[in-house]
């Protein structure tokens, strides 16, 4: 495929998807990356250096990533034209090369695209936002036992109120929808019908089941003990409540789960280990308490878009903040790994910020590719650098006797501890 601005590496091969949706990964895979806006200029080169070092150490030159820069955000407006924030060829390349990674992207000012991150997820149907949350020993935390937190969140990415189906108060569209609801549907629960913004919350059986299926399969593949469906079904019975019901259906129909003590909780035997996997549900507001009071009781979380946003950031705060929180957006075939924090433009180009989020997202990427030896080295390097208290400013200011490192120096410290 020919591209207008993207330079395809001269050496390197594509990752391909097999019929069973497993990956066929060559020894020199081409990986598209989006540098990112703001601090993307600092963290992306460090991530690439750390990943290359881990791959070299793990495979002694037998494997090597061929990095291919693709463009989105402010850099795309410089490379293409000022109105092109998300070029079609970037979407094509990410889809075509299967596995990619991105830095943080800014939200364009003005109309058109509300969020580049949401646009990428929707246009590539990356319906799972996967966020593992764990504590690295030595990372400053506001809670007493951050080590009890070891969860993986599966957040539905394509539906819920994030679908963006809403209309401004006073607009003809909002008034038309409100009129239809009150006059045609007999709705009497809208307290103020004038000057009222209105939105739609789509939650489908198909969208729910494919998300929960991914979470259950992850629990099986990674020897996890439970999957918790987090919802607000006590209030929103036909959307969030349906999410819970459809989730249990997947566990029963596709994984052979049976009622536990009369239900509604269920359990099934992991076919790979023989251990029981418990499938349970928790109301979203109670879950925000539980992650503080009893985090050790939770393992894999499957939830809708808005709940997942709240939960993943709240959990990240318990283990040291979003500076080191990794994430991935997945479809059945395409995987895009990402820094989960913002662009922090005031720090851009200062070689100051923590590159941990993007580096640990790259660790997830390597594991996804089956390159577990290299992924393990990144975890080892991260643990080593933090244990030695050689850290960036966000950790250094909260740790006694720590050595302050720049962004690039922190990457070098990780490499040294591999």
Swiss-Prot record:
Key words of the record: Glyoxylate bypass, Magnesium, Manganese, Metal-binding, NADP, Oxidoreductase, Phosphoprotein, Secreted, Tricarboxylic acid cycle
Major localization listed first in the record, in broad terms: secreted
Positions that bind D-threo-isocitrate: 115, 117, 121, 131, 155
Name under which the protein is recorded: Isocitrate dehydrogenase [NADP]
Subunit structure: Homodimer.
Cofactor binding note: Binds 1 Mg(2+) or Mn(2+) ion per subunit.
Residues under site feature: Critical for catalysis: 162, 232
An MF annotation (GO) of this entry: NAD binding
Gene3D superfamilies linked: Isopropylmalate Dehydrogenase
Role played: Catalyzes the oxidative decarboxylation of isocitrate to 2-oxoglutarate and carbon dioxide with the concomitant reduction of NADP(+).
The EC number(s) this enzyme carries: 1.1.1.42
UniProt entry tagged with the keyword 4Fe-4S: no
Phosphoserine: residues carrying this PTM: 115
Catalytic activity: D-threo-isocitrate + NADP(+) = 2-oxoglutarate + CO2 + NADPH
Residues binding NADP(+), per UniProt: 106, 341-347, 354, 393, 397
Taxonomic source organism: Pseudomonas aeruginosa (strain UCBPP-PA14)
InterPro entries: IsoCit/isopropylmalate_DH_CS, Isocitrate_DH_NADP_dimer_prok, IsoPropMal-DH-like_dom
Domain of life: Bacteria
Any GO BP: glyoxylate cycle
Cofactor: Mg(2+); Mn(2+)
Uppermost EC category: oxidoreductase
């Amino acid at each position: 495929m020919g591209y207008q601005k993207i330079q395809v590496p001269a050496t390197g091969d594509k990752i391909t998807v097999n019929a069973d949706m497993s990956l066929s990964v060559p020894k020199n895979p081409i990986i598209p990356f989006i540098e990112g806006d703001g601090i993307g200029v600092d963290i992306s080169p460090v991530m690439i250096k750390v990943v290359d070092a881990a791959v070299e150490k793990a495979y002694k030159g037998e494997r090597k990533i061929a990095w291919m820069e693709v463009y989105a955000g402010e850099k795309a407006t410089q490379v293409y034209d000022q109105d092109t924030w998300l070029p079609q060829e970037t979407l094509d390349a990410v889809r075509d090369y299967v596995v990619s990674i991105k830095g943080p992207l800014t939200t364009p000012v003005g109309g058109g695209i509300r969020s580049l991150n949401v646009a990428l997820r929707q246009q590539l149907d990356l319906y799972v936002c996967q966020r593992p949350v764990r504590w690295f020993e030595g990372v400053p935390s506001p809670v007493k036992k951050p080590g009890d937190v070891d969860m993986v969140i599966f957040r539905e990415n394509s539906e819920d109120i994030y679908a963006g189906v809403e209309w401004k108060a006073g607009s003809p569209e909002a008034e038309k929808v409100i009129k239809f609801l009150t006059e045609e549907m007999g709705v009497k629960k809208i307290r103020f019908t004038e000057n009222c913004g209105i939105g739609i919350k789509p939650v489908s059986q198909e969208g729910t089941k494919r998300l929960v299926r991914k979470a259950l399969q992850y629990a099986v593949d990674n020897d996890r003990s439970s999957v918790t469906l987090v919802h607000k079904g006590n209030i929103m019975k036909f959307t969030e409540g349906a999410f819970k019901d459809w989730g249990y259906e997947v566990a029963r129909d596709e994984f052979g789960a049976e009622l536990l003590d009369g239900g509604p909780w269920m359990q099934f035997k992991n076919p790979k280990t023989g251990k029981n996997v418990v499938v349970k549900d928790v109301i979203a507001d109670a879950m925000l308490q539980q992650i503080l009071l009893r985090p050790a009781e939770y393992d894999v979380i499957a939830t809708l878009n808005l709940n997942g946003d709240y939960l993943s950031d709240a959990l990240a705060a318990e283990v040291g903040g979003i500076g080191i929180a990794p994430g991935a957006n997945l479809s059945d075939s395409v995987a895009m790994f990402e820094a989960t924090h913002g662009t922090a433009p005031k720090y851009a180009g200062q070689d100051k910020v923590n590159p941990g989020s993007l580096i640990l997202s790259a660790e997830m990427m390597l594991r996804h590719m089956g390159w577990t030896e290299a992924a393990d080295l990144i975890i080892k390097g991260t643990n080593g650098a933090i244990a030695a208290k050689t850290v960036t400013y966000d950790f250094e200011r909260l740790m006694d006797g720590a050595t302050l490192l720049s962004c690039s120096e922190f990457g070098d410290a990780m490499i040294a501890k591999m």
